[in-house]
Amino acid sequence: MKHMILVPAIALSTAVLFSADKNPKREKIRKAILEQYDANDNGTLDGEERALILKTHDANGNGKMDRGERLALVKAVANKQKPKARADGEGDQKDDEASIWNTTGFKQANSMGGGEAAIPKSGKFRVFVLMGQSNMTGAARAKELKPPYTEKHDRIRIWANGRWEYFVPSVRFGPGVSMARQLAAFWPDDTIGIIKVASGGTGIRGFEKNWSFERANLTFDGKKGSLYKDLMNAVAEAKRMSKPEFSGFVWKQGGADGTKKVLGTEYYDIFKQLISDVRKDLGAPDLPVFMPSYMNDEDLLKAVRRILSDEELRKIRNLAGKPPVKDADLLAAVLAHLNEASPAKLRKAFGKRPYIAAVIAAQNRAGRELPNVATIYPGELPRIGGGNNHINAEGQIQLGKITASAVGEFYKAKR
């Protein structure tokens, strides 16, 4: 097994540590620091992430990284990556065990742990699997959270750092925070567990059970490795140390698959297979699935009709059937027409995700046709702003509550 060996960096300034560098040794150091502290996986160290580094390594408390403190940071990162030498070879084995939790899929969840926590013996241990891209990972700032979301809860756990921990975000957060709180209130005698495997900008092929670098790399995600394998590693270990009752799968993803025609066209079939695989491998054949999406068929139809001429609409209606035509049928005809439109026309309407309408339609179809799959429509949620598609702190709290309400309605109907 190869291990990155970091060189001493006594002369490196803080700016060099955090900035790209043409010197290969210094760049290796920077990437190692980024790998450890980039909690939201956006490829840079944001203010909160740099503040965490400063808080951890500012030994003299002067508010800046001095020469010796920078060296200590580099050594700390190096020691985390290198296995301890053991005559019996146990060091390599333990390093391999640790490495399965230091993956892209777990990076943000690892930053949300608030210390190891035992699972209460009373009641059920209801575990929810959360997967998706950036708005599941969460770009909302943890410093904007207010009580009770900043406090440990006796009956809420998150899978972090290869174990069950209290759920207390320290850098960024997604919808799981408020969702878990509301579900704990819904089931006052049970404990809520969250297993989150998510990575910003990841296409659905990055989550497939039958993962391959080539397929994942259609959305440039090959280097992230198999996120499904991450999930199964967590499930196996969680089963070993606790008795989880898998109670739901939450999927917040789609934007990355709106970039290419083939991605949008195949989305439904891949999602259907993903759900089948998750249910089988979790041993929960009827596992309910909750998928927050962007808009329902009616709103999506309104959105795509804006870019069509009256003549195009007449032709499409004739293909769809005699009026009155169901929204789903008309939408299918519209999307078939748009699938043959020029990419330039679609980019003019949908920006850098010209085929996003096909993805949204596939998610809506899944909610209609697949058993125990609910597509959720939270509406327009508050965003960070500045052209950023990421949901802000207020929006993530709303999304978590809306998702928890959908879970509650599902289980109420079963009573």
Residue ranges and their predicted role:
Residues 22-23, 27-28, 74-88:
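Intrinsically disordered, low-complexity Ser/Thr-rich linker and spacer segments
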